[in-house]
Amino acid sequence: GIRPDRDNDFADVARQTISASVDHEAGTLAMYALQRSDNSGQAFMFELYENERAYRKHLNAAPYKAFAARAPDIIDSKKKITLEPQFLGDKHIIPNERTINNLVIVEVKPEFQSEFRNIVLPEMVESLKVEKGVLAMYAGTDSETPKRWYFYEIYASEEDYQLHRQTLHFLDYLRQTAHM
């Protein structure tokens, strides 16, 4: 978590690290920082690397070292969760004050993993294809707890997110997976 009254510092150091890493490190494919809207002391970093070697390279690069030097004053606890990618889809993203980020965590019963995957992934493809306001959709399963799915989504605005929730493909996904 973020130390009390340090959420602005977290946002600053995250922005600096993300810009430098994505712009200058081959193999660092995407990085995003987000804080809970109902608890700004809880933050998440979403990082996507080409492979393990690119991740190791990032850990030894100047942007991460600068982040690591400042982090103890800003962050009082952290937990790393490694995900197995299930779906990675995005458009050209230029965040602004209207852009929203959602992190959704879903537990799927073990016996429904394959069926769930076969329903949710086409829904994500369709969302990116037909919805202008859907900017990115990433899905991964927890390496240690494979029944736990993480979805990181970026929408152009709150309105676009609400429109997404009313599409037939999203409603169909909800209907088909409710029991899973």
Question: PLM ranges: what are they?
Answer:
Residues 112, 120-122, 130:
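A mid-sequence, solvent-exposed acidic-amphipathic segment
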